[in-house]
Amino acid sequence: MSFFLGQILEKMGSIDKDIRFMATHDLANELEKDTFKMDPTYENKIVTKLLALTADSANNVQENVVKCLGLLIKRVKDSQATEIIDTLSKNILEESNKEELVEISGIGLKTIITNLPSEGSSISTLVIKNLVPKLLIGIDSEKLKDKNEIKMSCLDILNDLLQKYGSFMIGDLENIQKVVLPKLNATRPAIRKRAILCLANIAFPSPDNLFNSLLDYIIKSIEEAKKPDHISTLIQAIGAICKSSGYRLGKYLPKVMPHVLNYCDNNKFEQNDELRENCLLCFEAIIEKCQKDVTPYIGEIITLCTKYIKFDPNYSDDGEGEEDGDEEEEEMETSGDNDEEQEEEEEEEDLSDDDDISWKIRRSSCKTLCAIISTRPELLVELYQKVAPVLYNRFKEREENVRLDIFTTFVLLLKQLNKKLANPQAKEVLKQQVPKLVQSISKSLIDKSIRTRVGAIALLKELVMIIPGSLTGQVSQIVNGINLSLSEKNTNSNLKIEALVLLKLLLINEPAQSFQSHITSLSTHIVKCINDSYYRIASEALRVCQEFVIVFNKIRSSTDCKPIISNLFAANFVQLKAQDIDQEVKEAAISSIGTIITLFGNEIQSELQPCLSILLERLDNELTRVVTVKVLSRIINSSINIDLSSILPSAIKLLSTFLRKNNRVLKQSSLIALNDIVKVCPNLLPSSLLTGILTEMATLINESDLQITHLAFVFIQNLLKNYSEKHQAATLVNEKCIPPTLALLKSSLLQGVALESLLSLFATIVQLDEPGMKYEQLLTLLFNTAADIKQPVTRQSFHSISQCIAVITVNTTPALRKQTIHNLICNLSSVNEPLVLLSLSCLGEIGRRIDIHENENLQESVYKTFEANNEEIKQVAALCLGDIAVCSLQSYLPFILEQIKNQPKKQYLLLHTLRETIVKLSHTDEGIKTIHPFLQSILPLLFDNCVNEEEGTRNIVAECLGKLSMIEPNEIIPKLVEKIKSPSPLERSTIVTSIKFSIMENKEVVDQYLAPNISQFLSLLHDGDLIVRRSALLSLNYIAHNKPNLIRNDLSVYLPILYNNAKIKPELIREVDLGPFKHKVDDGIEIRKTAFECMYTLLDTSIDKIDVAPFIVSLCDGLKDTQYDIKLLCHLMIIRLANSNGAALLENITLLLEPLRVILMTKVNETAVKQQIERNEECIRSALRAVASISRIPNSDSIVKFEEFVKNTIRTTPLAAQFNSILSEDTMSNQDSMDTSN
């Protein structure tokens, strides 16, 4: 290294500039290597030489020198580093006449700052210490007061330092601020601009007192300012400070906003466009960063934006005043406009377009409106009423960039309607505006500018998707514009693609009749685009063709449609048979031609067979088989009855092989296609392939993919129903498919559509009565399968088998059915508990399907099992009796009600029975009709049991009341409301719980009868009894989760109640004397936990109605709670809030930092048991996830206190590794997936 450095030093002194260049270049390359080590003997010489070369006459040498100094600063001793800083600073401050040296020295210092480590280090501290005083001299020195270039260079360097090390420069910030603030008055705009950037970077890390003094100075300056340039600079400074410091500016808005609003619309300065633009940009920053505090001013800002988005004094549109009916606009259109540096001219004198900067004002208005649209979902209806018309009337904007911004703003407004909590009224307002909107945008569809057309199409695409079916009357206008884009020669490819996508969306979403007059022109353009050489245009055109054919099929009349279809088919066929085309085109061609064959196959008979042959080839191709299978299904199901005999046997053979492929989509599609074949054309299924198909089908019957299993069962059922050789099919099904089916019945995972299709299959099998699968044989197999289930057996173990037994029994002959029921009844007296459980389950499943009350000893035998020793048997017996009553209500319900009255020991089980009956009957109109006459007998009994001491019993009663209340709401809901005033807290608790079970019933009934009374039920949130209050909180949480619209408009009432219940109440903490020691019992834990669960739910369903500030105050209470569960719940709420309304969370983040710090620093006692240690570790991990979610919020790094919290509490502690691991996780892994709906 010494030899190398010696050579480099020698070459750097060469008189040949090329040698000097190569020497500095080689040195820079070496310095970039991690292995480079500076030789102490050469260090001083190298530094000295490099500093001397900053004045080199060759620019490329200077550039290399700057690079070397930036890399060298970290590798030299402090004394040499100081020399580098001092020399470069001296070049700037003392060599002011040498402009090139000043410039290169400034670049050198900026390069050094860039190369310094980001974290505070000794070298960084040294550079800051040496450089800041010199920069301040350069900015403020009297000697350099006329040297603007030096001031700008120093401000640039200082800004870089503040940006990178602001939080490490706290001690210097006050001096820097004192020096930089006066530069806001500088005569040169470039100096003012750099001063603003510096002040914004000072504001970010500055302590509160310094930040306050900065804002006080600026506000006072605005109040005293007279010149528009000075005012404009101060307002620009406020905007910049707001962007860097966010919510900290919020408390100053009452002092700031009146001035900004005034100057934005002040007639005195109406000729100063820059001032107006800066006001609007300031609004944008404030709206984004101070969402809560800016609320009182939003209305005025909207008014100003809608006014100045039309501000175009150099251009007069005579029709605009009439169209908008806006007098203000007419005034603005006749006003004059002055450049900022010119003297004030006469008002009537217009400027040339070259001097016109009014477009900046219109563009700034767009940006501010975008900020409002993005951050104020609660104003969506108002925005559509007030802003949308202004926007679409400005689609004629003459400046293209502004016009595109207006399009973007309107698209953003449209996208708000897709948000979960968007007010549906806004969509209705938009629908009324569609005619004018489309009329305005249609002009842009035929604009000469490609960018304008693409922007207009993007807007229309969004509109079609937001309000599908609402553009019926405007389709012609849009289609005319699409036709123009598709027909023009040399049209931009992107424009064609976008036009095709829009056409596809229109065809999918708008009524077919809307396209009646455009069929011929559209078909011509589609064919042309299908033949386009660019694969993206061709593939999109094929997708459009598919939708076009569907629309054409709906509106074709007796007129000859063959020419159009033939042309489309021919274009599709060319792409279908082509071998050397893109995969995207291949798939689109297969899908499109499949649709043509499906709907118009009779019109192209002569071309059909060659096409089907190619489709068979595509089916055998690994790349195209999935889409071809789907197309084959469509063709099979065609109403035209396409002759597929030439390809179907080969296709079936291929489909059967696909069933074993490790491709779920292919497997699923193949099963659907095989199903379609056995339904539509079973005779084309060769018997020779049946064994292979059913062998493959048997492998699909398992618990690993129940959707595939469901399709397999459906295929087997359709095969047995439709195949001509039923005996052969039944024999193979029995041999291949019944064994895996019986094995699946042992799985507790079998449920949903797979179970339903299996039950349907068993019903079909029994009705066929084929040898080997007769009723008695199936029954034996099912009972044997049940016997094979491992102990211990529960009712869930027999859930599927009992339903299968019930289905085959219901579908067999009456004689066999009666015998089976008799045997099941006899089994109830067995000592074999699993057999008793299975028999009870079977009787219940049979009884809820058909009336079996006439079977001897049924009621007595089932009721006797209520006395069994096994609790599981008693529970199943209760459900069995309830199920039997479903179809035998007249016979069984009076008995059940009588026993509830007279058998207190069996009352709990009998109430389960009653609930089972009510639940099953309330799901169908017929069931409701059946139970209605018994309401007068049931209700008194339920009301009597509302005061039962057992909470489980009261919950059953509440469910019954809730279900019944929706059967006869007129009568029952008033009775429930009356019971709210009951003196019994247990009865009040039961009544408020009942509404949980009401709200999931018929929506119309809930809205008509329950909604008007919901506030009366929830008045029990104020109840003095803890049990009642918790029941009310649980009901509120359930409503918030499932029917939030019932309470959304009253959250201002319910949220304070939740916040109050979330606090630790000393009066609910009691001391229990346990002899040797005393123990504190907190009776309010469950209340608090339920309140927080409800708050968590509301964050998901009603966040737009929540004022975040008091919500966070309550969150702080939760973070300080003594219960781990509540702390974990609060962490989840922070995560959910960070994801859904991060800006509002940041405005109040400082409240959360101390409680989070306490949690993260918590250590368990040395005597703590393992469970306590694990719970504390879990709580810390959860808190770290919450902090990580906050750190992911955009601009969270601008919150100084949060950054300091992360640094001091996490980054510099043993928690750092764990926190970094959480940060590196995918954001989705931190989703708050907890379900708190009770």
UniProtKB/Swiss-Prot annotation:
It is found in: Nucleus. HEAT repeats lie at residues 41-78, 126-167, 171-208, 210-247, 251-292, 382-419, 432-469, 603-641, 646-683, 688-725, 853-890, 933-966, 967-1004, 1008-1045. Keywords: Nucleus, Repeat, Ubl conjugation pathway. One of its GO terms (biological process) is SCF complex assembly. One of its GO terms (cellular component) is nucleus. Transmembrane segments: none annotated. This is Cullin-associated NEDD8-dissociated protein 1. The gene is cand1.
